[in-house]
Amino acid sequence: MRRTFFKAKIHRATVTHADLEYEGSVSIDEDLLEAAGIWEYEAVHVWNITRGTRLQTYAIKGERGSGIICINGAAAHLNRPGDMVILATFAELEEAEARDFKPTVVLVDRQNKIVAKDAVEVPGPARRVTA
């Protein structure tokens, strides 16, 4: 049986742009995409920590090293520059491959620069990233 598992996330990224006129998607700095193992055009959940909104779109490559997180199209109504978001992906896995699977967690600072990768998720305030 296949089950859906959390695959990767870019945690507490800062929205740098919101482009209502673009067709759709979320532009993500290519360095962040690679670190998280997220492919261009892969489905991405955008969970807005600041506003409490959630949506699903797809990733496109943003300029490498720029720190860009640009919410495009109609989703720009739900996300604004300065908002903090979690960008997450999921994967369907067979039971055998799921047993040893570990998701990729990329932590970023307020400029969307990587501060940790493959972090172990620990609930509670001790886990907060304030860099």
Curated annotation (Swiss-Prot):
Positions of substrate binding: T57, G73, A74, A75
Alphabetical list of CDD domains matching this protein: Asp_decarbox
Active site: S25, Y58
GO CC annotation: cytosol
Cofactors: pyruvate
Pfam families associated with the record: Asp_decarbox
Record note on modification: Is synthesized initially as an inactive proenzyme, which is activated by self-cleavage at a specific serine bond to produce a beta-subunit with a hydroxyl group at its C-terminus and an alpha-subunit with a pyruvoyl group at its N-terminus.
Catalysed reactions, semicolon-separated: L-aspartate + H(+) = beta-alanine + CO2
Keyword Lyase: yes
Molecular-function annotations in GO: aspartate 1-decarboxylase activity
Cofactor note: Binds 1 pyruvoyl group covalently per subunit.
GO biological process: alanine biosynthetic process; pantothenate biosynthetic process
Compartment list: Cytoplasm
Keyword terms, alphabetized: Autocatalytic cleavage, Cytoplasm, Decarboxylase, Lyase, Pantothenate biosynthesis, Pyruvate, Schiff base, Zymogen
Family the UniProt entry places it in: Belongs to the PanD family.
Assembly and oligomerization: Heterooctamer of four alpha and four beta subunits.
Protein function: Catalyzes the pyruvoyl-dependent decarboxylation of aspartate to produce beta-alanine.
Name of this chain's protein: Aspartate 1-decarboxylase
